[in-house]
């Protein structure tokens, strides 16, 4: 028996389905956070997003800690571009350019030590495709007027650019102005080692008069320039160059007075006011060749820095 069937097309609209990745994934010692799941309204930079992650704390200076322990390494796509100057990345990479933030517990900076116990914590930033293979950045422009201070007009002008590929990463920044101490904040090394040492200070430890914390009481004119590049030679080898320069010109007032009781019962007050001016230039160049394999480790580093 022959049967002929005539079929007619019909469209059926399906309900919209949205697939979202898990906000948290555990893979051994690595805890991966899908950053978009934690972002809130008004979160613009990577640093804004990091403050939302459970267990992660970002201090006012920009240093990052996890469960109360400061991170010992900050990587972008597995590469240590900035060392302790990672605020340059966290405060300039847009939050929506990051897919995942990985926190690695029991971290080993040297692969040859992987069998040894460790309590170090590191962080690795995974970027979205729109952040790769093309340059991007942001500009900063600000102006205002302050009644008190050396300069009535306060201004800040700067630009930061970066590019990330599979084998090459670059971040550069240039800023100048007379508003607060932005150059010191942006160039801070959260892992230490940013100070200038001499044979005398290495031997005797230097002298500290207990200067007050720097803030608005300093009328600043400062600027900074930095260029950081790392090249991935192979899976175990990198070549990195970091060049920094910062300039600070600051004035502040110091007042002190001493009151004496004279023999006739009267009081004599002696006062002193000092308004010192300091200008500091801080250049630094670091070149690093790193071979970090499971059976071999070589870390050759050349550092040239000064203050004048």
What are these language model-derived features?
Residues 2-22, 124-126:
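Extracellular beta-sheet/turn segments enriched in Thr/Pro/Gly and aliphatic residues
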Residues 22-308:
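Membrane-proximal, glycine/serine-rich, low-complexity loop/turn segments characteristic
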């Amino acid at each position: 028996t022959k049967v002929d069937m005539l079929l007619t097309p019909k469209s059926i609209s399906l309900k919209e389905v949205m697939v979202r990745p898990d906000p948290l994934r555990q893979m051994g010692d690595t805890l991966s956070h899908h950053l978009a799941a934690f972002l809130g309204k008004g979160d613009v930079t990577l640093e804004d997003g990091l403050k939302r992650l459970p267990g992660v704390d970002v201090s006012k200076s920009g240093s990052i800690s996890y469960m109360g322990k400061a991170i010992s390494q900050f990587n972008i796509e597995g590469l240590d571009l900035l060392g302790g100057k990672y605020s340059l990345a966290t405060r300039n990479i847009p939050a929506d350019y990051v897919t995942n933030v990985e926190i690695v517990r029991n971290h080993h900076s040297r692969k040859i030590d992987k069998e040894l116990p460790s309590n170090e914590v590191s962080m690795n930033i995974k970027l979205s495709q729109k952040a790769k293979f093309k340059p991007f950045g942001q500009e900063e422009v600000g102006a205002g007027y302050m009644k008190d201070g050396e300069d009535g007009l306060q201004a800040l002008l700067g630009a930061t650019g970066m590019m990330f590929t599979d084998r090459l990463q670059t971040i550069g920044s240039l800023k100048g102005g007379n508003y607060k101490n932005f150059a010191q904040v942006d160039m801070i090394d959260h892992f230490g080692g940013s100070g200038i040492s001499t044979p005398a200070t290495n031997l005797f430890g230097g002298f500290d008069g207990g200067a007050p914390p720097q803030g608005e009481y300093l009328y600043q004119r400062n600027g900074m320039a930095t260029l950081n590049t790392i090249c991935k030679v192979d899976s175990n080898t990198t070549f990195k160059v970091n060049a920094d320069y910062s300039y600070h010109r600051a004035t502040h007032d110091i007042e002190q007075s001493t009151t004496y009781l004279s023999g006739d019962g009267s009081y004599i007050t002696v006062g002193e006011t000092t308004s010192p001016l300091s200008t500091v230039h801080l250049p630094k160049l670091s070149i690093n060749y790193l071979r970090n394999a499971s059976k071999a480790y070589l870390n050759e580093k050349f550092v040239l820095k000064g203050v004048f």
